[in-house]
């Protein structure tokens, strides 16, 4: 059934797609873009749809576009068919076109806290939501996560600079600094010069934080191709294989399935098509 629906979408969208379509992906800040999961997943989706949509070119922006300019650049078309990955929010959905598929299979929504080594050594017990709410959080100023945590009733301490957030939690200027489960081991390694950092080993926070591919609002047909390709890749297992190559080692090291899970709401995705939820990774599925 899924394959027949996706094939129909592809056939309808093919009429609006041009031959040898160019996609220009947002450059990575941290490493070579071509080595990133976001680049490789997009390439996989485009490869899967070549038979229906024709050849393509996948380029990368010369420099990373600041997130504050994503909407402007996408709709201005100054960069040929600019495409980027980011967490879903109301502004993106209203002003851009998107592929309704969680590119990272929702792993960023699972958050594991960094804590101070002193707090961890003193010990703490969190067995209920009420107990968890007595602890304060640390997040970046202006981050979507900050708003989500505040909306759910947490006291949140904010900082402007990334490194400063690690110093804040180490100095207990807040209790927990939740980071994406797939990112936390890399974060600890990158900021190992900050003394007094530890990874909590008790809890796992979750709020839906899907990351979609976005393009300008006139690129609905091109986005349909990407969504179709991602779903084909998921259906045949090739996307999960790629995802595991990039993230499985990192998430295995933090024992997600052994933690106590606390779920929270994200009101900023209230009006999007929830069919993406079937593709969200569940670390407790086999428990």
Give the location of each predicted region:
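Extracytoplasmic small-molecule ligand-binding "clamshell" domains
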Residues: 20-94, 226
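Acidic, polar ligand-binding/catalytic clefts
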Residues: 63-131
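Short helices/loops that flank or line small-molecule/ion binding pockets
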Residues: 60-81, 151, 163-182
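Ligand-binding clefts/hinges and TM-proximal coupling segments of bilobed small-molecule sensing domains
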Residues: 140-151, 230-287
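Bilobed "Venus flytrap"/periplasmic-binding protein-like clamshell domains
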Residues: 31-48, 113-153, 165
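A ligand-binding cleft/hinge motif common to bilobed small-molecule-binding domains
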Residues: 75, 82-95, 176-196
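N-terminal signal peptide c-region/cleavage motif recognized by signal peptidases
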Residues: 14-18
